[in-house]
C-alpha cells in the first residue's frame, strides 16, 4: 500500500515538474533567445538583402530583451502564413510583433500589448479621386491585394465583401500588387502606410480615416505562464522607462 502511494506521489511530482518547465529556463540554460520574424514589415522588422541582417523597432526590442536576459539573440526567418506554426513547433521561443487575433490566440499565447495601430487603405495617388473612401473600394469591380497569413487578409474579407480579393505569398507583398497595377488597393497598418508613402510617392493613403484599432504583442507558447509573465512585465517596465 505504501509503495502504491509513493508511486502515485512520484508520478504527480514528475508531472508537476514537466508542467512547470518554461521557456525562460531553457533560454537561460542555452544562452540563446530564438526570435521568429518575417523581416518584411517596415518599420517593425526589415531584413537587409545586402547584409542579411535585420533592423527595425521590433529588432531593437528583441536585442534589448536578450541583453536583459543575459543571452544572445538568434533571429529565425519566418513567413506570415506559418509564423504561428513556428511557435507551436518550437522553431523559436518568441515572435516579433504580430496583431492579436482570436484565431492566433487559439494556439499561441500573447504577451502584454506594446503597440497599437489603425488600419488604412493604400491606393495609387493618381486614383485618389476614384478611391477617396473605404466604401469606394468595396465594389465588385475593385481588386484588393492581401498578403497570405496576415491579419489584414482576414480584415479585407470583412471590410470589402463585394471586392475581389487577391492574395500574394511572401516574400511578395500586397502593396507591390498596387504599385504594379494588378490591384486597386490594399490595407495595412497606419505605421507601415506612413513609411510606404514616403518610400513610394506614387502611393497614397485613402483620406477616409483609419479603422479597426489593433494591438500588437509578441507570441509565445500557449500555456507557458512563467515565460509570458516575464516578457509582459518586462514590456511594462520598459514602457515605464520610455524605452
Predicted regions and their residues:
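Periplasmic-binding protein-like
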Residues: 116-120, 194-236
Amino acid at each position: 500500500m505504501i509503495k502504491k502511494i509513493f508511486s502515485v506521489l512520484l508520478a504527480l511530482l514528475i508531472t508537476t515538474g514537466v508542467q512547470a518547465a518554461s521557456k525562460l529556463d531553457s533560454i537561460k540554460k542555452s544562452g540563446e533567445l530564438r526570435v521568429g520574424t518575417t523581416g518584411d514589415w517596415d518599420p517593425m522588422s526589415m531584413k537587409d538583402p545586402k547584409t542579411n541582417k535585420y533592423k527595425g523597432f521590433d529588432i531593437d526590442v528583441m536585442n534589448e530583451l536578450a541583453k536583459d536576459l543575459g543571452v544572445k539573440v538568434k533571429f529565425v526567418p519566418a513567413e506570415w502564413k506559418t509564423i504561428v506554426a513556428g511557435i507551436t513547433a518550437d522553431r523559436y521561443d518568441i515572435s516579433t510583433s504580430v496583431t492579436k487575433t482570436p484565431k492566433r490566440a487559439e494556439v499561441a499565447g500573447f504577451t502584454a500589448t506594446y503597440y497599437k495601430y489603425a488600419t488604412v487603405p493604400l491606393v495609387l495617388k493618381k486614383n485618389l479621386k476614384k478611391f477617396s473612401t473605404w466604401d469606394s473600394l468595396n465594389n465588385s469591380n475593385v481588386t484588393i491585394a492581401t498578403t497570405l497569413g496576415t491579419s489584414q487578409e482576414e480584415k479585407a474579407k470583412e471590410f470589402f465583401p463585394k471586392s475581389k480579393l487577391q492574395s500574394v505569398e511572401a516574400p511578395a507583398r500586397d502593396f507591390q500588387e498596387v504599385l504594379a497595377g494588378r490591384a486597386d488597393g490594399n490595407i495595412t497598418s497606419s505605421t507601415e502606410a506612413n513609411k510606404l508613402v514616403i518610400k513610394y510617392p506614387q502611393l497614397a493613403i485613402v483620406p477616409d480615416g483609419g479603422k479597426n484599432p489593433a494591438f500588437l504583442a509578441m507570441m509565445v507558447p500557449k500555456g507557458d505562464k512563467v515565460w509570458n509573465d516575464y516578457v509582459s512585465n518586462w514590456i511594462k517596465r520598459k514602457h515605464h522607462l520610455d524605452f
